[in-house]
């Protein structure tokens, strides 16, 4: 089974250059460990939310909103696509992710298409 780990971070917990550097290093090491044991199937960090766009269409009218988006304290920082036998195993893998300490990690099963 495949799962997406949606990595969020609280900007207040990675506010300094030193905190950000440490976070990037720790997440990189975590990713390498998943790659090494064959668990990691894909993933990537994302550009900052300040560069994001959100599109909403209501009643045929499209609006494009510029980030950051005030309704959320945590921001999505990246994702991993992993292989695991079941949701419990995926949660155990996600629990080791450093983002759980300075944000959160959401685990979602991928729905096979086709």
Residue ranges and their predicted role:
Residues 1-114:
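Conserved, structured core segments of small domains
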């Amino acid at each position: 089974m495949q799962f997406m780990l949606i990595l969020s971070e609280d900007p207040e917990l990675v506010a300094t250059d030193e905190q950000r550097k440490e976070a990037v290093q720790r997440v990189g090491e975590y990713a390498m460990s998943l790659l090494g044991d064959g668990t990691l199937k894909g993933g990537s960090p994302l550009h900052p939310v300040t560069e994001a766009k959100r599109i909403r269409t209501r009643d045929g009218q499209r609006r494009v909103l510029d980030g950051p988006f005030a309704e959320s304290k945590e921001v999505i920082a990246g994702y991993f696509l992993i292989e695991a036998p079941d949701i419990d195993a995926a949660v155990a893998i996600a629990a080791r992710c450093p983002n759980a300490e300075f944000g959160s990690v959401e685990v979602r099963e991928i729905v096979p298409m086709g």
